[in-house]
């Protein structure tokens, strides 16, 4: 009882809060961020790539190779040039966010109006309004993927957006799926052959029984 009476309530509360913070930190660090799709381009918007990354640094490393860049890189939002300089800000970005990667000495510039994206070079009429805009991004999650993944994003009247992400498969997964389909096909074919053979057997037995009855019938 004397030991309990000597305990300081504030120190006890501090110890409990520290234990809770340590436990929360361990739970948070045990779950790594997932791979998410992004679209990146260079400062002139002439080259665009679809990449997947879990962290800001991973996206910069992949953009360095995909866009053939060099030196220190800066990541900004393509829409308004906001710098993505922290991992916390990067994790708040939505999937399929359009980002621009700048080399040292380069700066963000707004998109020129009247020109369609992806460098089609076709000018729209001055007073026209977009009805729908569809973007296609083909990317690989792994260099060993046989077919790339496809991301499709459609925006209608600038208000409603719809996106679809079709994941590609590697050689092992494709072979596994082909074997599974072949197994199911052969299994179905086997059941069909068994049904046909059973039907033929019943037909033959019925014919023989009819012939036997015909022989035994008195004239």
Curated annotation (Swiss-Prot):
It is found in: Lipid droplet; Endoplasmic reticulum membrane; Golgi apparatus; Cytoplasmic vesicle, COPI-coated vesicle. GO terms for cellular component: COPI-coated vesicle; COPII vesicle coat; endoplasmic reticulum; endoplasmic reticulum membrane; Golgi apparatus; lipid droplet. Residues 33-110 form the CIDE-N domain. Its main location: other. InterPro entries: CIDE-N_dom (IPR003508). Keywords: Apoptosis, Cytoplasmic vesicle, Endoplasmic reticulum, Golgi apparatus, Lipid droplet, Membrane, Phosphoprotein. It comes from the Eukaryota. It is a peripheral membrane protein. GO terms for molecular function: lipid transfer activity; molecular adaptor activity. GO terms for biological process: apoptotic process; COPII-coated vesicle cargo loading; lipid droplet fusion; regulation of apoptotic process; regulation of triglyceride metabolic process; very-low-density lipoprotein particle assembly. PANTHER family: CELL DEATH ACTIVATOR CIDE (PTHR12306), LIPID TRANSFERASE CIDEB (PTHR12306:SF10). Interacts with DFFA. Interacts with DFFB; inhibited by DFFB. Interacts with APOB. Interacts with PREB/SEC12; facilitating loading of SCAP-SREBP into COPII vesicles. Lipid transferase specifically expressed in hepatocytes, which promotes unilocular lipid droplet formation by mediating lipid droplet fusion. Lipid droplet fusion promotes their enlargement, restricting lipolysis and favoring lipid storage. Localizes on the lipid droplet surface, at focal contact sites between lipid droplets, and mediates atypical lipid droplet fusion by promoting directional net neutral lipid transfer from the smaller to larger lipid droplets. The transfer direction may be driven by the internal pressure difference between the contacting lipid droplet pair. This is Lipid transferase CIDEB. It comes from Bos taurus. The lineage of its organism: Eukaryota, Metazoa, Chordata, Craniata, Vertebrata.
């Amino acid at each position: 009882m004397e030991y309990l009476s000597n305990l300081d309530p504030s120190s006890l509360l501090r110890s409990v809060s520290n234990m809770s913070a340590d436990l929360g930190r361990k739970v948070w660090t045990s779950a790594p961020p997932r791979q998410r799709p992004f679209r990146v381009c260079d400062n002139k918007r002439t080259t665009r790539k679809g990449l997947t990354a879990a962290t800001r640094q991973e996206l910069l490393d992949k953009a360095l190779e995909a866009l053939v860049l060099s030196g220190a890189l800066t990541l900004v939002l393509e829409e308004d040039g906001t710098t993505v300089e922290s991992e916390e800000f990067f994790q708040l970005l939505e999937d399929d966010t359009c980002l621009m990667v700048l080399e040292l000495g380069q700066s963000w510039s707004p998109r020129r109006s009247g020109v369609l994206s992806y460098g089609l070079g076709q000018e729209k009429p001055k007073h026209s309004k977009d009805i729908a805009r569809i973007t296609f991004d083909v990317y690989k999650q792994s260099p060993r993927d046989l077919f790339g993944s496809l991301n499709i994003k459609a925006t209608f009247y600038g208000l409603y957006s719809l996106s679809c992400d079709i994941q590609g498969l590697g050689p092992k997964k494709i072979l596994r799926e082909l074997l599974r389909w072949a197994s199911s096909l052969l299994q179905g074919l086997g059941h069909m052959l068994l049904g046909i053979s059973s039907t033929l057997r019943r037909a033959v037995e019925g014919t023989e029984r009819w012939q036997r009855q015909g022989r035994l019938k008195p004239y």
